[in-house]
Design a protein with these regions (language model features):
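Extracytoplasmic gate region of multi-pass secondary transporters
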Residues: 49, 277-327, 420-423
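Extracellular/periplasmic helix-loop-helix junction of adjacent transmembrane segments
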Residues: 52-85
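Cytoplasmic membrane-interface "Motif A"-like loop-to-helix N-cap segments
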Residues: 96-107, 341-352
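C-terminal ends and interior cores of transmembrane alpha-helices
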Residues: 108-126, 353-368
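Glycine-rich segments within core transmembrane alpha-helices of 12-TM secondary carriers
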Residues: 167-191, 412-423
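Multi-pass alpha-helical transporter architecture, strongest
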Residues: 218-225, 444-485
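C-terminal transmembrane helical hairpin of 12-TM major facilitator-type secondary transporters
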Residues: 346-390
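A late C-terminal transmembrane helix in Major Facilitator Superfamily
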Residues: 401-433
Length: 485
């Protein structure tokens, strides 16, 4: 008996895909190609934010340093707003021209944007053209970042070896942690070499030069990676009027070799398929909302929250975040390994349940002086690392290859824009109104919604991908959506 999603779509073909022989490939090279782009994406996004106080004076107009800094952060916010558009435009190219095409395009545009910011003339030289060019570069980078994560999700879903798909997901997403850490390292080097005045006088440009060179390195690596075998198979099937089912992963015919050109899929509009998968899109949106709200609360707003609550200074909380990042990365790698044995949903649900039920009590205990800020930071980031470890590939398996990048990207980018991009503003509004104590309830609530949404899907024990099935070939976990009574 086949299962169906809420739109009544049959969950067919999963067993055949799971049981097919794996192709001879070099999955570690493909993993590096996926991960290096995540490093570039995170570095680019973080370095702009931490360098903004240093370049705002040179590039933006305003009657005061504060006004110039706000204008610089406006460019940051606009980049968030165009992410959903990028997930559709570039994601569509990823679904029709190949995963490698999308991966090289996104990282190439990010690199170009960084190099452009490194050389853009100042406001004193070209007037209003300077901030307009900066905002234009951020819009291009926002479009690229909107498609980067779903393109990686599609690529890892389809290229990771049997039994290691979620671990590969964790490693590739771990590039975000490494990229963020790298941006702070570069910032400290610039301050150590040039001092604050030197960075303000133009040394900030070296941060973008490094980002551009990092992006070009990632572009070179990705151009040499193999195309997804699933995409290659989908292109051939599309030419014959067939299609691969949702859940199709690594077990497909031989991929296009490194540097080889993938066949283009002459696919129809993705919108009819997406409309038929509205339930799955909602699940991805909810899961991403829960993860991104917690991420921005702990990694961006937490120092201000703890200081306002009288629990710790910003310096103490920032130091605790370094230890928390280690816990985050450890949880992601451990969670990925656990998901390959147990399935993604137990790992994802454990993390969200901990955030939903434990965030508020833990933070109240911290505010009362009963729990150190370092312990709270480590626990929250460890819990967050579990859903982050598996969410990319988990979402990728919900959709057929023909629309996978767009289907993952659209709800993901929308959730990040709505819940991540707005969280710092929401936090400041609540604090200014004297309601700092309300803040922990927001990530707890979104985590609870994500946990509830996860029960709309399950790893069906009747599929060979479930570890309890006697025909289980390598601990793969195809996902089906069922109408729970």
């Amino acid at each position: 008996m086949t299962t169906t999603d809420r739109a009544g779509l049959p969950e067919a073909g999963v067993a055949a895909v799971a049981a097919a022989p794996a192709p001879a490939r070099r999955p570690r090279r493909e993993l590096v190609a996926a991960t290096v782009g995540s490093v570039v994406e995170a570095y680019d996004w973080t370095i702009y934010g931490i360098l903004a106080p240093y370049f705002a004076e040179a590039l933006f107009p305003g009657t005061s340093p504060t006004a110039k800094l706000i204008a610089a952060y406006l460019g940051f916010a606009l980049g968030f707003l165009v992410r959903p558009l990028g997930s559709v435009l570039i994601g569509r190219l990823t679904d029709t021209r190949g995963r490698r095409y999308g991966l090289t395009l996104t990282v190439g545009l990010i690199a170009a944007g960084s190099l452009f910011l490194a050389v853009v003339p100042g406001y004193a030289s070209i007037g209003l053209a300077a901030p307009l060019l900066v905002v234009g570069a951020r819009l291009v980078q926002g479009l690229s970042v909107g498609a980067e994560n779903p393109s990686v999700a599609a690529y890892v879903t389809e290229t990771a070896p049997a039994g290691r798909r979620y671990f590969y997901s964790a490693v590739s997403y771990g590039g975000v942690v490494l990229g963020s850490a790298l941006s702070f390292i570069v910032m400290n080097v610039l301050l150590g070499v040039f001092g604050e005045s030197g960075v303000e006088d133009g040394a900030w440009r070296y941060g973008f030069v490094f980002g551009g060179l990092l992006g070009l390195t990632a572009l070179w690596i990705r151009r040499g990676a193999a195309e997804s075998a699933v995409f290659t198979a989908a292109a051939g099937k599309a030419a014959q009027g067939a299609a691969l089912p949702a859940g199709a992963g690594a077990a497909e015919p031989e991929a296009a070799g490194p540097g080889g050109k993938a066949p283009e899929v002459k696919a129809p509009s993705p919108w009819p398929v997406l409309r038929a998968h509205l339930g799955r899109l909602a699940v991805v949106f909810a899961i991403t909302s829960g993860a991104t709200t917690a991420f921005y609360f702990v990694t961006v707003d937490f120092p201000s929250y703890a200081e306002s609550a009288g629990a710790a200074t910003k310096e103490e909380t920032s130091a605790a975040l370094l230890l928390g990042m280690v816990a985050l990365l450890a949880a992601m790698l451990g969670g990925g390994k656990a998901a390959d044995r147990l399935g993604a949903l137990p790992v994802l649900r454990f993390g969200f349940a901990g955030l939903a039920l434990g965030s508020v009590p833990l933070l109240l205990a911290m505010n009362a002086g009963r729990v150190p800020v370092a312990v709270v930071t480590v626990v929250l980031l460890f819990l967050l690392g579990l859903p982050l470890a598996v969410s990319n590939v988990f979402a990728g398996q919900l959709f057929p290859p023909a629309v996978r990048a767009v289907a993952v990207g659209l709800p993901t980018a929308a959730a990040i824009s709505l819940f991540g991009g707005t969280f710092p503003m929401l936090a400041e509004l609540l604090r200014s109104a004297g309601h700092n104590a309300w803040l922990p309830w927001w990530p707890a609530l979104t985590a609870a919604v994500a946990l509830a949404a996860s029960w709309a899907v399950h790893e069906h024990p009747g599929h060979p991908g479930h570890p309890g099935h006697p025909g289980h070939p390598g601990r793969e976990h195809p996902v089906s959506v069922t109408p729970h009574a």
